[in-house]
């Protein structure tokens, strides 16, 4: 049995039952417990997000981030290869219906990430020198006192370091290298080394440099991809109704619209949709709370609103555009997968520039994700080993980025799925245990903080 076959068997267990039950269960729990906060709080989140866009130099504290910088760092991590290569892989393997399950995962995930951000704010740590840090390890320990809390937090910390810092960033590098090799013929290892060197420069600047880079890159890369995608979609506007038909019908009857995904089944559509949805928007995975924890806000719920917008932008905007480009152009029946499928879809209108367009987007999307994931992993390195281990960690991450460019794409994606799925378990256990505190904090915002704020107190 090959390593890939072994990883696939583990993934079948995790994504076939454990992951779906955990993500859907937690999403439903917070959706109902918080009264559909993803709908009620959407306007607040939207206003805070785009208000922050024009005042992103807001107070970040001595060693923290502004609310916008925290969101930019979170989106930098969320909007990565999962939105281009991951969405394409989900469609190629699970059929168009996989996109529907990504929608469901994202809708429920908006309430989950709200809870994650609120708890990250609630349990964040501020050092004597003003340095702010936070993340699931702190609210896991807050949820469970004694040895169990310490052990569960340590397990999560180890998982996220491997899942994102090492394996996840290898995936990002792999997709950059593959797309640039296709578009420009550049050797994969050359791109891997280039990305690793630039990444190291950003890493050595700490939180402040990471925040400055992400708040600059994220709005530009998102706008560039949105415009480029809309042009292709509107060029195939007559195919849009059929595309949504295939997504909806394919969610429940994959064989009816399988096309290129001849082996598509309902189980496969759900598995690929939820797994790729998790890898893309990261709700419930426990990654983005590291960014939301260090934001300077007046109440934890305020950052919860902002966090929800990250999932919305990632899945309902960016990922949807990729899906519609692939489906409306008829590219899903080509037998291609990953970044190559997305490149082919864009090339149906742009020609050779389509490959170049995806290569450029992939570089910025994946590079920004590498930065975000490094930051998340670093927080856990500090938690486990202290600041002295950060330098070694940054070097190992860069080695993974360089070597990840050469790995077999299927194995890299499958291993990333495996580690991402395992991260959900300790995070989910803590969120369920803290659900009462999430509700209490939510109620405090609406019953006390907001009325007092309106009175000018």
Range-by-range predicted roles:
Residues 57-93, 119-122, 128-137, 141-143, ...:
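Alpha-helical membrane segments and immediately flanking helix-loop junctions
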Residues 108-116, 193-207, 218-238, 271, ...:
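Selective recognition of specific alpha-helical transmembrane segments in multi-pass small-molecule
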Residues 115-123, 128, 228-246, 254, ...:
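Extracellular/periplasmic helix-exit of transmembrane alpha-helices
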């Amino acid at each position: 049995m090959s390593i890939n076959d072994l990883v696939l068997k583990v993934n079948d267990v995790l994504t076939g039952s454990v992951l779906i039950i955990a993500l859907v269960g937690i999403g439903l729990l917070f959706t109902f417990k918080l009264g559909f906060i993803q709908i009620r709080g959407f306007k607040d989140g939207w206003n805070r997000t785009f208000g922050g866009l024009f005042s992103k130099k807001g107070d970040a504290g001595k060693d923290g981030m502004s609310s916008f910088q925290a969101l930019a760092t979170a989106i930098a991590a969320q909007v990565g290869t999962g939105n281009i290569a991951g969405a394409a892989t989900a469609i190629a393997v699970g059929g168009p219906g996989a996109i529907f399950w990504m929608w469901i995962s994202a809708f429920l995930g908006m309430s989950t990430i709200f809870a994650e951000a609120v708890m990250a704010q609630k349990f964040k740590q501020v050092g004597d020198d003003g340095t702010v840090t936070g993340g699931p390890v702190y609210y896991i320990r807050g949820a469970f006192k004694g040895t169990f809390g310490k052990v569960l937090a340590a397990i999560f910390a180890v998982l996220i370091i491997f899942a994102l810092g090492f394996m996840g960033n290898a995936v990002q590098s792999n997709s950059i290298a593959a797309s640039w090799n296709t578009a420009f013929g550049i050797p994969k290892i050359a791109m891997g080394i280039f990305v690793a060197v630039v990444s190291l420069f950003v890493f050595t600047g700490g939180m402040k440099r990471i925040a400055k880079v992400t708040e600059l890159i994220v709005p530009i890369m998102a706008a560039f991809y949105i415009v480029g995608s809309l042009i292709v979609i509107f060029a195939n506007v007559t195919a849009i109704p059929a595309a949504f038909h295939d997504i909806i019908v394919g969610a429940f009857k994959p064989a009816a619209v399988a096309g290129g995904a001849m082996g598509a089944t309902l189980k496969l559509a759900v598995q690929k949709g939820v797994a790729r949805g998790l890898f893309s928007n990261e709700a419930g995975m426990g990654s983005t709370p590291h960014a939301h924890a260090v934001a300077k806000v007046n109440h934890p719920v305020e950052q919860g609103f902002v966090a929800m917008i990250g999932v919305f932008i990632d899945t309902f905007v960016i990922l949807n555009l990729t899906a519609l480009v692939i489906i409306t152009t008829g590219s899903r029946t080509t037998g291609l997968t990953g970044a190559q499928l997305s490149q082919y879809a864009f090339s149906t209108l742009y020609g050779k520039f389509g490959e170049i367009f995806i290569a450029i987007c992939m570089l910025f999307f994946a590079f920004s994700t590498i930065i975000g994931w490094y930051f998340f992993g670093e927080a856990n390195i500090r938690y486990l080993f202290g600041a002295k281990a950060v330098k070694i960690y940054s070097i190992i991450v860069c080695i993974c980025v360089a070597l990840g460019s050469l790995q077999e794409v299927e194995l890299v994606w499958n291993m990333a799925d495996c580690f991402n799925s395992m991260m959900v378990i300790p995070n989910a256990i803590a969120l369920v245990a803290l659900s009462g505190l999430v509700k209490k904090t939510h109620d405090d915002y609406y019953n006390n903080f907001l009325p007092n704020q309106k009175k000018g107190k």
